[in-house]
Amino acid sequence: MVNNVYDLVTRTMEQEFPGRVAFRWVEDATGTVKEKTYAEYAQDIRRAAAWFARNIPEVEGKRVVLLSRNCYEYGVNTFGAVLAGAVLVTMNQKKAWDELSWELELAEPALILNDGVDYGCRDQLEAAYGERLRPMDVWKDTAPGGLEKKIDPNALMVMLFTSGTTGRSKAVMLAERNFFTVMQMHVAMGDHLLDFKHRQLPEDKNDVLSNFAILPLFHLGTFICLFSWPFKGWALNLCSDLRNFYRDLGLMHSDSIAVAPVLMESIYKDVKRGRADKLNGLWNPCGSSAMFDSELLLGLVENGMYITQCYGMTETCGDGLVNYAQAEPHIRALGKPDGHCEYKLDETGEICIRGGCVMLGYYKDPEATAEIIDKDGWLHTGDLAREDEDGYYYMVGRKKNLIILGTGENVSPEELERRLNACPEVQECVVKEMGKKIGALICCAEEKQAEVRAFITGLNRTLPLYQRITAVEFSAEPLPRNAMGKLLRR
């Protein structure tokens, strides 16, 4: 199996699948679908690599930052930059200037490639970085150049910022070996998809699938697809704006999609209301394990869909647990170890992972690195779980979210949130410590607040004294989430 970027481009793209479609997207100006084959993609990667090598002095190890919505050039710049010897850095272009400027100062970019859209801090970007700010297709008029196999598999190649829910993001340092260790899991997932497809449609001999990429490419969950989908010569159908979800999906048939909770719920409603035709043949929603209600997942399965769930972190390059279960009770699980790294539950029940998937560390933060990776190389995920007799792991809660009371008891906010969400009037909620009390921030309609309070009163009667919710705040507006749809706790 290919185990490096150079071979992925020169062997897989240029020799194995040159004529297959690598990318599709809808051109907004015309509403038509544009395509790039793997041969065209590889030529543009060669253009980009040549441009970076010529225009970034002493390019080796220099930072190239991408600030852009999902687009074809994102993939070109990713491989072009690292093949030239630079370090590729992805960032959330929609962050407020306070956060974005902090991340940029940490990364010290030699070059910032952007899509030209003003996300609210264009003036500050231009004032701070001037000539270092260039368009995503800056290389378009450059002749394709030669490529060298020179990436050190154990050296820093890519930096991605964590989508934190409790504080500042950290810059995760990943090497080439991290990505290609994880490819073993992704290739196996692809085999599972083909097996399901051929069992459902035995007359369909087509082994080429396509993935609808709606989640942002700056996040590992989508970014990893730039590496994994070329392995089988499959296509990424890019969507850059959630508002165009149904338009783009209708124009580009897609088999698979990685989804956040809000989008999974939308797909579920379409299926349950007899509007599956809006999904244009989509049959494989893939999401982060334990983020979805099992009733929702089972409803999709009953209507012919195949659910895949993955548990991982940016710090493990997305590697971790995989769940192919399509029925209770295992559909609620995080999944099983994928078999390509080592996994264990420590004495506290925390999931720990060791192997080629584990990051190099947090950039310029050795203290935080030492807190998460122990002296024996085990990465401590911060997630608490239990294992059943079939080898499935089930989420218990986040270690850092535990509310530790003055009496010594530990309270899992996730468990209380699950119970609160059983109230029909609760749209969403976050349980956290509020002034030494267990508190709940609840989104619901103003006229429903009394009913929610009554529900909490009844719930408290069923809970031990130390678990009872004694502080409640309401919001008529949706609670804040990060870029991947996770509720913020800060």
Please identify what each model-predicted range represents.
Residues I112, G355, L360-G361, L384-Q467, ...:
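AMP-binding/adenylate-forming catalytic core of the ANL superfamily
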